[in-house]
Design a protein with these regions (language model features):
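Non-catalytic terminal regions of proteins
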Residues: 1-49
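Intrinsic-disorder/low-complexity, polar/charged segments
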Residues: 22-28, 73-78, 97
């Protein structure tokens, strides 16, 4: 397994983390996370055609819940894919805290914040290995 830089972001007001990484093999990060229910390692199957992926996870080291957002390459980090994956992550966070995305403003602010996290990784402003 190759070492992949995981960029961790903390929304502070929510008990949930966002991890963003760029790797051409999503399984490179599987050893660092458990499935959301904590019952086993995450596994990525049939990801050859995926350009990006988001899933709810639990971090193995500190048992923090969050969403991992993975991109195959910087080329795949276009505005469409960033928005798409940020939307998945925002929905997962709202599901985790029992909030309704129909309460528009909090959801939209969160979506924008997650997109900004991804943009930060794309622009290499933050590289924190977790």
């Amino acid at each position: 397994m190759r070492e992949v830089v995981l960029n961790r972001f903390d929304p502070v007001i929510y008990p949930y983390k966002i991890w963003v990484a760029i790797t051409d093999n999503f399984n490179d990060v599987s050893g660092r996370f458990l499935s959301y229910d904590g019952k086993g390692d995450i596994k990525f199957l049939d990801t050859d055609k995926c350009h990006a992926m988001t899933m709810a996870v639990m971090h193995k080291e500190d048992y923090k819940y969050g969403a991992i957002i993975l991109f195959k390459s910087k080329k795949e980090m276009n505005i469409g894919n960033i928005t798409h994956e940020a939307s998945h992550a925002a929905k997962l966070l709202f599901e985790h805290i029992g909030a309704d995305p129909a309460e528009h403003e909090p959801f939209e602010y969160l979506l924008g914040w997650i997109a900004e996290c991804i943009w930060t990784v794309l622009k290499e402003k933050k590289q924190k290995n977790e």
